[in-house]
């Protein structure tokens, strides 16, 4: 049964849940709770679903993001937009020489799959699955006051048994729980560009990307090109920047919202790169966006607060370098939903059981998210702080990914397997 065919449910039971943020994590949590007949309200600061651009493409993984979509009863809707041929990934150096390629399967696998979907489309699927009125748009949370009072621009309420912060990097819910910790600047800033209708406007790049992604690397720099569902290419240029406000005209020397000026600056910054890759800058059109990347400390955690918790980026903000952010966020939603639903079934001591369940969820989440944070932090240092990338790091990067996905007892074998593969791949490349 698809989202649009879900049968009507009786009046909601148990605790009343407030979710702050209608991103993928917040909407997934709301969807799972709504299906279990738990009372839930989502508050979103944006005025509408399409209020702003929602970023690039995401790959969902078998045991986390994809499992959550199945648990939410949204598998058919997901398959309508999933790009299994988008699993192609190539790592190249600045002269466009390939150092590692993962080919697209073009088909589903029951063992391991990482299909792509646009972030905006994923959010649209999740939001559309919720009953009309469940998301309260244009509700910007200003602060949380003790015990668990939500203060919005035009509303103040204490009408919830649990408040879940899923509102991203600058979470007000997290600030209430842990006021002395803010995200820190990673030292990396990026431009986001786009090439619409790439098959016609940039056919060489369209062929290069092969409906997937190409990641170009040189010392302290990265240029990524990713296929989007609408046929456009998303371009990200990432490099080391001294200060988080590097995009101010007085610091970077140009207006970063001016595409022509940004192109000129980027072509100068990437002047030593092959034109096969930098054509992605020249062919871009439309809006030019900039931002700085932030992260929470690896191993970040908090003392349990009754009636409030956080998930997703609000709990474990990290860079995009491991490709795990949205997957672990959807896993958070799936696990927290199970905890809340279990508490809702206890009609005699529901609030106490809810608190115990949420605290147990947090204790499970802390080591799980630390593992992902550590992988992301290590990969960020590999990519941006190691000479001779990508050639100098490919074996290390692949080993990190394999170790992340395998039990510790298999790590020596995994390391040997990766290095053997890289050696054979190197020999084969000499004969091409």
Ranges and model annotations:
Residues 2-17, 22, 32-36, 59-198, ...:
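Conserved N-terminal helical subregion
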Residues 3-15, 35, 80, 90-91, ...:
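C-terminal helical "tail/cap" subdomain of flavin- and related membrane-associated enzymes
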Residues 19-39, 43-46, 164-165, 287-384:
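Conserved mid-domain beta->alpha element of the FAD-binding
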Residues 45-49, 55-58, 65:
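Glycine-rich active-site loop/strand segments that organize a redox cofactor
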Residues 53, 175-176, 321:
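Conserved catalytic-core motifs of eukaryotic protein kinase domains, centered on the activation segment
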Residues 100-114, 118-119, 157, 196-289:
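Conserved FAD/dinucleotide-binding core of flavoprotein oxidoreductases
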Residues 170-171, 190-192, 220-224, 315-316:
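Histidine-centered metal-chelating micro-motifs
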């Amino acid at each position: 049964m698809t989202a649009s065919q879900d049968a009507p449910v009786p009046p909601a039971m148990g605790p009343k849940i407030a979710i702050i943020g209608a991103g993928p994590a917040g909407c997934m949590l709301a969807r799972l709770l709504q299906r279990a007949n738990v009372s839930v309200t989502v508050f979103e600061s944006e005025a509408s679903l399409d209020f702003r651009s929602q970023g690039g493409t995401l790959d969902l993984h078998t045991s986390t993001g994809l499992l959550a979509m199945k648990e939410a009863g949204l598998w058919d809707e997901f398959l309508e937009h999933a790009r299994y041929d988008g699993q192609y990934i190539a790592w190249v150096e600045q002269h466009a020489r390939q150092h590692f390629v993962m080919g697209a399967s073009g088909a589903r696998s029951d063992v391991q799959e990482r299909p792509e979907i646009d972030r905006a489309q994923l959010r649209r699927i999740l939001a559309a699955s919720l009953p009309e009125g469940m998301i309260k748009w244009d509700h910007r949370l200003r602060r949380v006051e003790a015990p668990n009072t939500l203060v919005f621009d035009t509303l103040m309420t204490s009408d919830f048994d649990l408040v879940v912060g899923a509102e991203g990097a600058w979470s007000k819910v997290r600030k209430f729980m842990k006021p002395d910790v803010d995200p820190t600047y990673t030292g990396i800033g990026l431009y986001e560009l786009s090439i619409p209708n790439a098959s016609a406007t940039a056919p060489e790049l369209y062929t290069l990307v092969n409906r997937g992604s190409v990641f170009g690397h040189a010392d302290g720099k990265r240029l990524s090109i990713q296929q989007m569902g609408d046929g456009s290419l998303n371009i990200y240029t990432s490099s080391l920047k001294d200060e988080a406000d590097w995009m101010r005209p007085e610091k970077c020397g140009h207006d970063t919202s001016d595409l022509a000026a940004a192109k000129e600056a980027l072509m100068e910054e990437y002047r030593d790169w092959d034109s096969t890759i930098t054509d992605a800058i020249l062919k871009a059109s439309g809006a030019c966006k900039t931002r700085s990347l932030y992260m929470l400390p690896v191993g970040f955690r908090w003392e349990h607060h009754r009636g409030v918790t956080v998930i997703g980026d609000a709990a474990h903000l990290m860079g995009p370098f491991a490709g795990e952010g949205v997957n672990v966020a959807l896993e958070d939603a799936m696990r927290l939903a199970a905890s809340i639903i279990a508490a809702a079934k206890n009609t005699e001591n529901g609030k106490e059981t809810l608190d115990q369940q949420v605290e147990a969820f947090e204790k499970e989440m802390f080591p799980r998210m630390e593992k992902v944070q550590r992988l992301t932090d290590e990969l960020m240092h590999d990519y941006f702080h190691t000479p001779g990338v990508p050639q100098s790091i490919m074996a290390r990067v692949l080993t990190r990914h394999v170790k992340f996905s395998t039990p510790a007892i298999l790590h020596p074998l995994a390391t040997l397997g990766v290095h053997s593969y890289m050696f054979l791949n190197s020999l084969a490349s000499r004969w091409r």
